[in-house]
């Protein structure tokens, strides 16, 4: 009787293996592969105090994180917040509706409209701090990267809290070494186990991503959109097609779930299996696409785009295309190409200032920090000056900074300057936006007088006068710009245009950061001036070691459709540039997803079908 009381009956569903996707000749395009995953099951008694439960879970997850990373693997990264290039928290989603859907999920709200204005306006950092408080994590004692990993795991567990005995994946596709280390330490890792999961794989993914899409865990919004009959077949832990063929044919590819009923003891160990129903595999899908033709067409299109870029590339740092009467004579200044390495994050500017930075990185960073201090000082001086020059009298560079502050930062990014409140026919608005006869200082002070400024986004301070509000705006701007990676990119753009940061330095960093395999002769030549940066870049584009999709210079995208004239079958449907859907499937790489969403070359946009292939948009 005593043993019986310590046993708990549990039922767990077992997903069916997803069907494969083949081309017209039976060549595999998407398949499944068994791999080890680190999982955790919440077996902490429900009557445990929240503080004690948080400590147990956090200690366990900290140990898991150490084991996983010591063996060269990584924990899940599918949370809606990532670290930007300056190491600050930012939302992975750039689409406002998707961002608010994530914020609503964090706050346990079924609908976006249920959020308060304060909740809607929370920054990514505030969301992280809110969750840290909920999870008992002290964010002041750890760096942002560690906190984000812990929040990733705790949040994933929280999504399964509606069913206590549901396991949560903490790390997928881990090595044998990680699996062995977890098993060796299992006695001290409460609820942690190694499972063998079926992971989705896409060989040659970049060529087919725009067609195939990818899989991932179903979202609350996707689940809510299902019919009542469909909800009987799906649960919130299911892996589903998120876009492309994977999404359209999800009901075909999905297998039928199996079910296992068993008893566990108070330590969560299985003591007896009561019943078991085997899962059934999903159906395979065959496409009219010819895999080899698809790959060949993709490569042909990439070569063609590279050829056009090279034909337009000019060995000048700055260039005004408006002077050309015929667009066919417009050139691509090499300065734009050098800038693309930073603007499109081919190289990582946050590494420039690290203690282990290489020579070219250090030199560029020193130039940048001096420039940033000068520009911030000049900007704040103009914003504080009632008699500052009118916008039209500023230099092209200073205009770019003012545009960024007003249009990008205050309007689009933060919403401090409320676009929906601005009166387009207002005389002062016209003077700023069209005639360019006033300064940003005068414009913002006028915006305050017209109640176009949302002071709730400046912090918790109360403002009793227009002067205090303007001071609050300036203080906010000064602090924000210090950590704003997009503003940093704009600074680098003008450093490169002026030659203060050289093309040779940028090209050398490509080797220093491992974007291309180290070539000592070329690298040293770039540093000492014996290798011409323009010639180096020309060669790398010509040989496609640096691609049009990476540089995102115009043209950088295109599409090819090949059909069989007899049957009408689509044999190839190429959209360039593609993306690696393996990094989005299973457990999404949120940082990579954000790079794709913000990339100037728009890899999610299907250039054949003319729509955005990502499910989030």
Each language-model region and where it sits:
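Short hydrophobic alpha-helical segments used for membrane anchoring or interfacial signaling
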Residues: 560-565
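Membrane-proximal periplasmic segments of bacterial cell-envelope enzymes
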Residues: 1-541, 545-559, 578
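Surface-exposed intrinsically disordered loops and tails
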Residues: 318-328, 594-606
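Conserved small/polar residues in nucleotide/adenosyl-binding loops
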Residues: 611-616
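Flexible glycine/proline-enriched surface loops and loop-helix/loop-strand junctions
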Residues: 278-282, 602-610
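A short, polar/charged loop-to-alpha-helix boundary motif
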Residues: 38-47, 578-599
């Amino acid at each position: 009787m005593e043993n019986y009381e310590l046993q708990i009956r549990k039922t767990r569903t077992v997903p069916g293996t997803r069907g494969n996707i083949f081309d017209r000749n039976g060549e595999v395009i998407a398949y499944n592969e068994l791999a080890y995953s680190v999982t955790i099951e919440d077996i902490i008694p429900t009557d445990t105090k929240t503080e004690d439960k948080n400590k147990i879970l956090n200690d366990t997850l900290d140990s898991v994180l150490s084991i996983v990373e010591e063996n060269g693997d990584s924990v899940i990264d599918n949370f809606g917040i990532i670290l930007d290039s300056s190491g600050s928290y930012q939302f992975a989603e750039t689409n406002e509706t998707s961002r608010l859907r994530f914020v609503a999920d964090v706050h346990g709200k079924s609908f976006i409209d249920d959020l308060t204005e304060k909740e809607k306006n929370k920054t990514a950092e505030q969301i992280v701090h809110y969750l840290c408080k909920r999870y008992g994590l002290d964010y002041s004692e750890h760096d942002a990267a560690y906190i984000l990993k812990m929040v990733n795991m705790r949040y994933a567990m929280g999504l399964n809290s509606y069913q206590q005995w549901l396991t949560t994946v903490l790390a997928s596709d881990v090595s044998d070494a990680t699996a062995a280390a977890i098993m060796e330490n299992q006695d001290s890792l409460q609820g942690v186990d190694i499972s063998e999961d079926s992971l989705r794989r896409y060989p040659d993914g970049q060529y087919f991503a725009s067609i195939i899409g990818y899989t991932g865990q179903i979202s609350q919004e996707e689940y809510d959109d299902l019919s009542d009959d469909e909800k009987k077949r799906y649960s919130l832990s299911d892996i589903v097609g998120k876009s492309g063929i994977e999404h359209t044919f999800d009901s075909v590819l999905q297998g039928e779930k199996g079910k296992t009923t068993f008893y566990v003891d108070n330590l969560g160990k299985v003591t007896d299996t009561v019943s078991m129903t085997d899962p059934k595999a999903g159906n395979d899908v065959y496409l009219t696409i010819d895999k080899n033709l698809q790959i060949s067409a993709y490569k042909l299109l990439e070569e063609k785009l590279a050829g056009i870029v090279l034909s337009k590339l000019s060995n000048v740092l700055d260039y005004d295309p408006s002077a050309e009467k015929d667009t066919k004579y417009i050139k691509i200044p090499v300065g734009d190409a050098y800038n693309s390495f930073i603007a499109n994050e081919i190289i990582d500017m946050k590494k420039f200032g690290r203690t282990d930075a290489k020579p070219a990185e250090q030199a560029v960073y020193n130039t940048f920090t001096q420039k940033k201090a000068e520009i911030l000082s000049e900007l704040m001086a103009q914003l504080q000056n009632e008699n500052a020059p009118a916008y039209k009298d500023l230099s092209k560079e200073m205009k770019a900074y003012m545009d960024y502050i007003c249009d990008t930062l205050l309007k689009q990014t933060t919403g401090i300057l409320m676009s929906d409140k601005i009166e387009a026919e207002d005389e002062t608005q016209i003077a700023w936006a069209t005639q360019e006869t006033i300064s940003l200082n005068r414009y913002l002070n006028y915006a305050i007088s017209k109640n176009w400024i949302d002071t709730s986004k400046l912090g918790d301070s109360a403002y009793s006068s227009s002067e205090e509000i303007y001071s609050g705006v300036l203080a906010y701007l000064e602090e924000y710009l210090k950590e704003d990676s997009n503003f940093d990119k704009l600074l680098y753009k003008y450093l490169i245009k002026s030659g203060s940061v050289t093309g040779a330095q940028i090209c050398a960093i490509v080797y220093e950061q491992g974007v291309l395999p180290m070539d000592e002769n070329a690298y040293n030549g770039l540093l000492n001036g014996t290798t011409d940066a323009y010639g180096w870049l020309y060669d790398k584009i010509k040989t496609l070691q640096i691609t049009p999709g990476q540089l995102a210079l115009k043209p950088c995208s295109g599409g090819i459709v090949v059909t069989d004239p007899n049957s009408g079958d689509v044999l190839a449907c190429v959209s360039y540039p593609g993306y690696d859907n393996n990094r989005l499937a299973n457990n999404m790489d949120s940082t990579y997803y954000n790079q794709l969403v913000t990339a100037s070359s728009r890899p999610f946009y299907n250039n054949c079908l003319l729509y955005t292939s990502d499910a989030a948009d």
